[in-house]
Regions:
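PRPP-associated nucleotide enzymes
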Residues: 1-313
């Protein structure tokens, strides 16, 4: 990508709030486009300024999933047809990421299908954050810049939480690597919750591997959907003698009844990023912005600088 090529940032309907903050950080206006909705549910995308020869960054999280994904695909297609120099999809929250493997017979692999759709539509690059599974990067045949919210969270942890009595925890075994990174970086002990599920979004039983008695526990996860796992883990920590329990997660999917569960749980605080718009329905929820991080990633892509140095852990 040429460092001299001017760039433009556009937003889909779902992520305009974040795209505006990204543009404020970059010191540039948000690009003008029109998304026209029709009575039958279809919509059409058109750019309202020339993008010929420009590097075009399209900001859109794919949640709620289907319409926002289709909107992004049409934005990509329109940009290619308008002779953009390159088209970079900026997807702070990548939907379908939990469907990254064939965990039982006769199932789809949704994350691979979405990667194929984005590639076919014509993206030249993807910038995303905290994929549910790192291997999803390999589903793409274009460069993927995988950002991590850890730098945002670590600043908050070091300035706002009691480090001398803190313990890192993961609400399930699958998040062990993620939690371990925080534990090693901060020099803190770690415990693991082991769970079994009856079905999707329903936890059957859970137990703690490790000791939390008298400690301030910080649960680490990549997303919270219905909040069943995270709140069950928090309640279990308190039952086992924890002094307090907080949680951080990159993506606030927060499907019903998540807000109610968090509000009624042992959690004293639930911290998210703004990768997904969260209409605050719970006093315990705090949202940290990732706009500056994405703005810096965009700037570095345009200037040809390293992206990996943005990562703290």
């Amino acid at each position: 990508m040429s460092a001299q090529t001017p760039f433009l940032v556009f937003s889909g309907t779902n992520s305009r709030y974040l795209a505006e903050k990204i543009c404020n950080s970059l010191g540039c206006p948000l690009g003008q486009m029109n998304i026209q909705h029709f009575a039958d549910g279809e919509f059409a995308v058109s750019y309202e300024e020339s993008i010929r020869g420009r590097d075009v960054f399209l900001v859109q999280s794919t949640f709620p999933n289907s319409d926002n994904l289709m909107e992004l695909l049409l934005m990509i297609d329109a940009a290619k047809r308008a002779s953009a120099h390159s088209v970079i999809a900026v997807i702070p929250y990548f939907g379908w990421a939990r469907q990254y493997r064939k965990d039982k017979p006769l199932v789809s692999i949704g994350a691979k299908l979405i990667a194929d759709m984005l590639s076919t539509a014509g993206i030249d690059r993807l910038i995303t954050m905290d994929l549910h599974a790192d291997q999803i990067q390999g589903f793409f045949n274009v460069p993927v810049d995988h950002l991590y919210a850890s730098s945002i969270f670590l600043d908050y942890i070091k300035t706002s939480l009691p480090l001398d009595n803190l313990c890192i925890a993961t609400p399930d075994v699958g998040g062990t690597k993620r939690a371990s990174s925080y534990s090693k970086y901060l020099g803190l002990p770690m415990v693991i919750c082991h769970k079994s599920r009856l079905r999707a979004n329903e936890v059957a039983e859970m137990r703690i591997i490790g000791d939390v008695k008298g400690l301030d526990v910080l649960l680490i996860d990549d997303m919270v959907d219905t909040a069943g796992t995270i709140t069950k883990a928090a309640n279990l920590m308190l039952e086992n003698g924890a002094k307090s329990v907080r949680a951080i997660a990159s993506h606030a999917v927060m499907s019903d009844p998540a807000s109610t569960r968090v509000d009624q749980s042992a959690l004293t605080e639930m911290i998210f990023t703004d990768s997904i718009p969260y209409a605050k329905k719970c006093e315990k929820v705090k949202v940290l912005s990732v706009a500056d991080m994405f703005a810096e990633a965009i700037r570095r892509v345009c200037s040809g600088e390293s992206i990996s140095s943005l990562y703290t852990i």
